[in-house]
């Protein structure tokens, strides 16, 4: 609707003039038959729907009376659209003070008319068509077929079978490729299954196509195929798709923005406001040939305001879009944001996948009307897949395509479809809408055969394959072939040139003509950068936390080295190196968590790429720039305080060089981590290489192991490590040109006071005998091999890495697509699949037309009969007349009787004896209000809502999107977590007790389930924990089986829930949601929030019949519903109708045919409800619920002043007064908050969680793979380290690096915990399934065994390669110390888990929790005594050394690994001393060696030169770092106590922060 439209109105109905089918034989006139009558009705409905645009126009302009409007002719629509009163004025420069001001063109006006605005834009284009270059785009496809990458059944990957599964898949892939290469065959369709069977179609400019079919029929795949969005499945090479002469490849590469697919899910940046979201899109789609005299930003702002006004979003402009976890606009409003986003794009060919899901009936109809207006005026084309299509909406479509299990069974004019299927042999019941009738054809239990045709033995197609064959041989198919071939054969060179010129005219100056994008790369980066700045401004928590944590770490780490670094002697050599090493590491790894944010925004980037808004590389470039301020802020807050606290060289040049190097470090590593994130498909895939690189770069920086000491096989790592060059520059920067006074001479003491010259030497490396100082250049040359000439070389290398990683990151972002999603399929546990194969239910190779496991039972029976029939029979006859009679009878009941359903009849008849919990209690509420705090006060969401739900009744809760329907359910069910509730809520006149939440069933709008559980397991879990404790397991299991039977879930009862696309489909998930609540046997009532949302009409009907069935068994049901058909509406007993603001406009009986409700509104001033109108759409229209409509009066005030309201108040007063007298209160046992004991809850929840871990192989294998690779890498880096001084230091640093796996493993765990917590807090806690104690304790218990296993693996791949066992063998303690090391390794991995639970228990966002854990870990590691020994710490920080848990771990690992062995110095570690003349080395050094108690001489008898080693035992070396083997068991006990403390603190913090406290939220 919001594009620059075409000026020409010729050919508006192009393609609509197809013949009406085969000519009928001449017959005697017998009056109007049923088909003719139906045709007249169809025409009347079409004309009525077309006149709705005119009536809307009249209401807006003030002409005509909406109460007396009648159907207009089709030409009225054209006159309305192309009326001459629109002259084409500039709507952007309107001035309210201008006498010619037209408020209907001003989106900020309440009287804005989107229809007039589009007409006005059309007139502007017509006035200067050479400038605006209008064009149109249609599409035709021939032999379109698509296949998925896997079969329709697969087994679930687990920790045990995942390696074998992947090996099999790899082998299959390799062998297939080799086979095809050898035999020269195509890979297409070799493995996997066909989603779409060959089909044809054609949609011309100005047309609307509706695609109908049940979930799983292939509607989504068809839309994706014709919108060039085929990632995840393959299109057959034989397929031909053309868009006015352009191939799908050309469209994808050059004109992608003109063909757009809008997915069913609403994915947006949650922290952007509605205005910011749409304004960004408008900027990126602002054409160069826009209205003259208007700049880009003004035009984009106007288009944004028009979109918001058109779709009723103006009031939400400054509200965050939000998502399931970030509070924002309502679900219906979020769907409208998605619609507005595509409308602003102005694409000429749009594909909408279930775009009306979540919208109320009136808004959904207005959306289709808007599409119709857009198509008619702008000559665009739209294809819409709708599961629930109302009569009025269907009448607006030009063509319809019906799909059945991937087969096309009709494509043609929407007015002919009904007659086609009636001719095929299926009857349309009188009360059924055409769309519902067409969809019902694809459901064996819903469709009704023509009794006369059956009696005469006429064969009626039944299976999808038979209907497809019937379609291929029909006259309608031949007509379609003519249209498609005409489209394909038409010379389209002129149209191609027209489209090409129009595309170039829209593009900004610097955009390439062949580019599919409207604006240049520079403008894309600019606009996305602004968007990212808005996002950060709206939610700066992560950035603020990062900056503040860096500042805190600078103060902590800097003060740790403060005292020792005040000295400038040689004692600071090690600490200066350690401090610089710490600075490099901290700056380098501060960007590791950016990987998290990449995966959060990737789906949005991929969506916008398909809209041709911007290149993914532009988004990547902008995101890099948007993070620059945060990076600079963190660099300043960390490096400046840190530099001066650790007393590095006080020289301006040295300081700025230090700052420059660390800035380079930050950006080089940031780009590297972004590269890893962009090249990986999933977060676990990214974290494993990131953790390995983190470890490798840290170890091969040059501090832990100087390059001269590195093993030959691994030295190359230091050469490709950017940090090694940057560390070298910082060391040169600090040590060059400085002489450090010697702090310790060897030998020293009273006996050596008079020693001179070569008789003493400084103990530091690089010393020269006789000198009282050590040159900094000599030190770094001797120890590290660094030379001053390389100082600036490293800067160049660092900058080269930044540029290289940046371009690599942009490349991967541009060309690496996201993870593929397989075709929709059921997933079963491996054991179930084995049983199914034994029984012959599935086989390794599927036959071409074999029924799938998603096929319904009824159709399965039909197809099985077909397989056993004669092969020469094209169509099946029903073998039993009784079956056909039953079909007709059932269908009559379906559409005539309000109490039965065809689709449910069989299952209900089998399950009539199911003992559903019956309730006698009446649930009622009075004057219920709900207020939430906002910036300037409070906002009322519910305004004095009254009502009741009685046993055995079905009450509908209806209202526009955002009217407060879900909020009302949440308030009544005690599920609100903020705000103030006032009013009274009673059960039989008594206040709700604490057992109330578990005594009700609440089916949420979102189908929240544990994705790794099976359907049966989910139901049993609910039954075990929510049914009474005194009910036996056998009874609960039996009841679950009955629920499975009632809900018709037997076919997939053992299937894994999974995620949409790989698991249960939308319908199956909705049934499971209802089943989980039924399995709990709610004794009071059942709440259902949008149970029919996302379902097709037949499933929605079945769901409604299920609710009716439950009500007939005594259940009280309150159900919100968005798009009820007229048929569905009549199934409800009562209606609670809310308007915007949570205000009641009606509560009472619906009456037969909704007459009672209709009479009420008509009696209070509403215009008459047309006889064939949907009462739901009519009543939403009269209260102004649809965008662009307004109520003619205040229906809330009318309701409060009505007689019906007064009668309701009397009834409520009677209930409050009399009901407590008639019933007794609940017993103490019944009032328990939970049905089962805490211990039983912990047992079951832990059991379920253990299964989830086992069935989440990526998490476990990532954990173990990270452990194996990291520890093995450390082990072989320090392979068989000796006991020289450098070898001892290497072993100490190996132990230090052993703990570096902390961050990667913890970061893998946090998202898994968050998923568990979201499910628990959203569904299981509110329903009182189990307590918070059971939740947190089970999280703790289940992690421990896996971490013990990880610790065991780490021990074996680390302990033996490093060679610690050799030190133990010297003291004959091999087994004891090996066992001790294993205990500490296991304890450390359990500690990682305990810290993870601790930080995430009270923090919402995993990224913030990871930052906090990293902060704790760095502090613990810094103060553990390795980098800074206790003797050099300031007195203030001594307590940190004592409270750091790693102090005790490192102390224990050092002593267990190194103690009780001899030191053997290497040649360059031996100090050379010349003894006085006449003395041997032993005589000269003996006093010194006795005073220090350590050291040894290589040759004591020498009189010329002594070679002295400073240590003789590893125990002496351990003493320098305050480590002792005697404290090993004390250290183990203290470290274990820290683990226990973490777990206890996690439990306490979870209770403190996240458990709702009992408060008096409900006030009178």
Swiss-Prot record:
Keywords from the UniProt entry: ATP-binding, Glycoprotein, Membrane, Nucleotide-binding, Repeat, Transmembrane, Transmembrane helix, Transport
Region: Disordered, residue numbers: 1-37, 839-872
GO cellular component entries: cell periphery; fungal-type vacuole; plasma membrane
Keyword GTP-binding belongs to the record: no
Polar residues bias (residue ranges): 1-16
Glycosites: 754
Protein name: ATP-dependent permease PDR10
Organism: Saccharomyces cerevisiae (strain ATCC 204508 / S288c) (Baker's yeast)
Gene: PDR10
């Amino acid at each position: 609707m919001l594009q620059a439209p075409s000026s020409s109105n010729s050919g508006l109905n192009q393609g609509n003039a197809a013949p009406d089918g085969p000519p009928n034989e001449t017959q005697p006139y017998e009056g109007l038959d049923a088909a003719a009558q139906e045709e007249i009705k169809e025409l009347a409905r079409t004309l009525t729907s077309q006149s709705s645009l005119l009536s809307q126009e009249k209401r807006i302009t003030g002409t005509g009376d909406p109460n007396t409007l009648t159907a207009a002719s089709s030409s009225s629509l054209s006159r309305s659209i192309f009326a001459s009163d629109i002259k084409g004025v500039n709507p952007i420069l309107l001035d309210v003070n201008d006498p010619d001001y037209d408020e209907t063109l001003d989106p900020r006006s309440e009287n804005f008319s989107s229809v007039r605005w589009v007409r006005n834009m059309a007139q502007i284009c017509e006035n200067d068509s050479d400038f605006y270059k209008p064009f149109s785009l249609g599409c035709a496809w021939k032999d379109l077929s698509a296949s998925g990458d896997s079969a329709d059944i697969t087994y679930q990957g687990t920790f045990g079978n995942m390696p074998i599964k992947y090996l099999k898949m790899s082998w299959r892939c390799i062998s297939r490729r080799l086979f095809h290469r050898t035999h020269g065959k195509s890979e297409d369709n070799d493995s996997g299954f066909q989603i779409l069977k060959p089909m044809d179609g054609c949609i011309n400019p100005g047309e609307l196509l509706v695609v109908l079919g049940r979930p799983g029929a292939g509607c989504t795949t068809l839309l994706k195929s014709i919108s060039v969005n085929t990632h995840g499945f393959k299109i057959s090479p034989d397929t031909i798709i053309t868009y006015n002469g352009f191939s799908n490849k050309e469209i994808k590469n050059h004109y992608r923005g003109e063909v757009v697919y809008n997915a069913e899910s609403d994915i947006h940046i949650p922290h952007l406001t509605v205005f910011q979201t749409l304004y960004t899109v408008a900027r990126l789609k602002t054409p160069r040939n826009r209205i003259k005299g208007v700049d880009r930003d003004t035009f984009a702002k106007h288009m944004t305001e028009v979109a918001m006004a058109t779709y009723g979003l103006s009031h939400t402009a400054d509200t965050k879009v939000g998502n399931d976890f970030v509070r924002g606009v309502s679900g219906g409003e979020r769907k409208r944001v998605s619609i507005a986003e595509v409308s602003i794009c102005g694409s000429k060919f749009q594909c909408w996948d279930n775009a009306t899901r979540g919208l109320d009936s009136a808004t959904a109809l207005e959306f289709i009307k808007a599409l119709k207006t857009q198509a008619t005026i702008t000559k665009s084309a739209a294809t819409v897949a709708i599961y629930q299509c109302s009569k009025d909406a269907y009448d607006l479509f030009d063509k319809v395509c019906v799909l059945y299990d991937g087969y096309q069974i009709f494509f043609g004019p929407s007015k002919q479809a009904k007659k086609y299927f009636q001719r095929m042999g299926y009857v349309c019941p009188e009360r059924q809408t055409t769309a519902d009738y067409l969809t019902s054809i694809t459901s064996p239990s819903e469709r009704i055969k023509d009794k006369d045709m059956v009696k005469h033995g006429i064969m009626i197609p039944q299976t999808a394959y038979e209907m497809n064959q019937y379609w291929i041989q029909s006259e309608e198919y031949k007509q379609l072939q003519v249209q498609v071939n005409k489209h394909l054969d038409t010379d389209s060179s002129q149209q191609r040139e027209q489209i090409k010129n129009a595309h170039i005219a829209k593009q900004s100056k610097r955009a390439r003509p062949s580019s599919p994008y409207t604006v240049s790369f520079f403008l894309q980066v600019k606009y996305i950068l602004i968007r990212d700045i808005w996002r950060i401004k709206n939610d700066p928590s992560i950035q603020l936390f990062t900056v503040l944590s860096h500042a805190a770490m600078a103060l902590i780490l800097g003060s740790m080295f403060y005292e020792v670094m005040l000295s400038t002697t040689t004692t600071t050599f090690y600490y200066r190196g350690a401090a610089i090493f710490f600075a490099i590491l901290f700056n380098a790894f501060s960007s590791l968590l950016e990987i998290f944010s990449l995966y959060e925004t990737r789906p949005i980037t991929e969506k916008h790429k398909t809209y041709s808004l911007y290149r993914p590389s532009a988004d990547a470039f902008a995101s890099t720039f948007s993070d620059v301020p945060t990076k600079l802020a963190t660099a300043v807050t960390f490096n400046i305080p840190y530099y001066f606290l650790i007393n590095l060289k006080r020289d301006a040049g040295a300081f700025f060089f230090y700052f420059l190097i660390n800035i380079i470090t930050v950006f080089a590593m940031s780009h590297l981590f972004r590269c890893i994130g962009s090249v990986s498909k999933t977060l676990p895939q990214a974290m494993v290489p990131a953790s390995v690189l983190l470890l490798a770069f840290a170890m091969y920086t040059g501090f832990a192991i100087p390059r001269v000491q590195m093993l030959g096989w691994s030295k190359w790592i230091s050469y490709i490590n950017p940090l090694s060059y940057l560390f070298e520059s910082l060391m040169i920067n600090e040590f060059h040109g400085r002489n450090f006074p010697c702090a310790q001479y060897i030998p020293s003491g009273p006996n050596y006071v008079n020693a001179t010259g070569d008789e003493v030497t400084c103990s530091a490396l690089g010393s020269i005998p006789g000198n009282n100082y050590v040159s900094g250049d000599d030190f770094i040359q001797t120890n590290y091999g660094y030379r001053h000439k390389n100082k600036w070389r490293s800067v160049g290398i660092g900058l080269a890495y930044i540029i290289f990683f940046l371009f690599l990151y942009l490349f991967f972002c541009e060309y690496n697509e996201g993870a593929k999603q397989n075709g929709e399929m059921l997933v079963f546990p491996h054991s179930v699949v084995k049983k199914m194969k034994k029984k012959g239910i599935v086989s390794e190779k599927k036959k071409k037309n074999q029924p799938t496991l998603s096929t319904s039972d009824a159709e399965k029976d039909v197809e099985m009969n077909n397989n056993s029939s004669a092969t020469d029979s094209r169509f099946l006859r029903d073998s039993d007349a009784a079956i056909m009679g039953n079909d007709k009878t059932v269908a009559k009941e379906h559409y005539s009787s309000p109490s039965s359903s065809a689709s449910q009849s069989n299952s209900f008849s089998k399950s009539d004896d199911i003992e559903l919990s019956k309730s006698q209690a009446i649930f009622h509420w009075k004057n219920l209000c709900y207020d939430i705090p906002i910036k300037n006060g409070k906002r009322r969401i519910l305004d004095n809502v009254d009502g009741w739900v009685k046993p055995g009744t079905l009450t509908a809760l209806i209202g526009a999107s955002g009217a407060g329907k879900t909020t009302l359910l949440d308030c009544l069910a005690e599920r609100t977590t903020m705000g103030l509730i006032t009013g009274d809520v009673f059960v039989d006149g008594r206040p709700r007790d604490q057992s109330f939440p578990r005594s009700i069933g609440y089916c949420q709008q979102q189908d929240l389930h544990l994705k790794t559980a099976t359907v049966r397991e989910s139901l049993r879990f609910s039954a075990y924990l929510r049914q009474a404790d005194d009910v036996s397991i056998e009874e609960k299991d039996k009841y679950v089986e009955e629920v499975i039977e009632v809900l018709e879930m037997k076919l997939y009862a053992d299937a894994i829930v999974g995620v949409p696309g790989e698991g249960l489909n939308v319908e199956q998930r909705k049934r499971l949601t209802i089943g989980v609540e039924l399995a709990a046997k709610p004794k009071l009532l059942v709440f259902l929030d949008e149970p029919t949302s996302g379902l097709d009409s037949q499933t929605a009907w079945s769901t409604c019949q299920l609710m009716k069935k439950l009500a007939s068994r005594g259940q009280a049901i309150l159900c919100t519903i968005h798009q009820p058909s007229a048929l569905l509406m009549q199934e409800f007993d009562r209606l609670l109708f809310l308007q915007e603001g949570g205000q009641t406009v009606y509560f009472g009986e619906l009456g037969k045919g909704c007459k009672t409700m209709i009479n009420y509104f008509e009696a209070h001033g509403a215009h008459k409800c047309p006889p064939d109108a949907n009462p739901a759409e009519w009543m939403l229209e009269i209260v102004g619920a649809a965008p662009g409509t307004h109520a003619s009066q205040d229906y809330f005030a009318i309701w409060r002043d009505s007689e019906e309201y007064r009668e309701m108040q009397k009834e409520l007063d009677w209930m409050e007064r009399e009901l407590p007298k008639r019933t007794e209160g609940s017993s103490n046992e019944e009032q328990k908050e939970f049905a089962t004991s805490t211990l039983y809850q912990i047992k079951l929840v832990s059991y379920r969680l253990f299964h989830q871990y086992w069935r989440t192989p990526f998490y476990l294998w990532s954990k173990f793979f990270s452990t194996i690779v990291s520890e093995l890498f450390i082990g072989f880096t320090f392979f068989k380290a000796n006991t020289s001084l450098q070898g001892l230091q290497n072993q100490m640093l190996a132990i230090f690096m052993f703990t570096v796996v902390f961050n990667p493993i913890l970061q893998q765990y946090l998202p898994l915990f968050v998923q568990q917590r979201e499910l628990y807090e959203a569904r299981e806690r509110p329903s009182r399934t189990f307590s918070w104690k059971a939740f947190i304790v089970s999280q703790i218990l289940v992690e421990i065994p896996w971490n013990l296993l990880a610790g065991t693996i780490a021990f074996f791949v680390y302990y033996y390669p490093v060679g610690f066992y050799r030190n133990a063998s010297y003291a004959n303690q091999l087994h004891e110390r090996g066992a001790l090391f294993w205990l500490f390794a296991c304890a450390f991995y359990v500690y990682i888990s305990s810290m993870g639970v601790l930080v995430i228990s009270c923090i919402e966002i995993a990224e913030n929790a990871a930052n906090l854990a990293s902060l704790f870990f760095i502090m613990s590691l810094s103060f553990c005594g390795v980098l800074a020994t206790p003797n050099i710490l300031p007195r203030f920080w001594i307590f940190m050394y004592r409270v750091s848990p790693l102090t005790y771990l490192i102390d224990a690992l050092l002593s267990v690994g190194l103690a009780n062995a001899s030191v053997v110095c290497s040649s360059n570690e031996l100090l050379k001393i010349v003894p006085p003349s006449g003395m041997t080395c032993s005589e000269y050094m003996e006093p010194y060696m006795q005073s220090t108690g350590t050291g040894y001489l290589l040759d004591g008898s020498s009189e010329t030169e002594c070679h002295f080693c400073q240590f003789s035992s590893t125990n002496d070396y351990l003493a320098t770092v305050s480590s002792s083997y005697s404290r090993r068991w004390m250290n183990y006990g203290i470290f274990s106590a820290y683990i226990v403390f973490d777990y206890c603190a996690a439990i306490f913090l979870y209770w403190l922060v996240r458990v709702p406290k009992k408060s008096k939220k409900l006030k009178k």
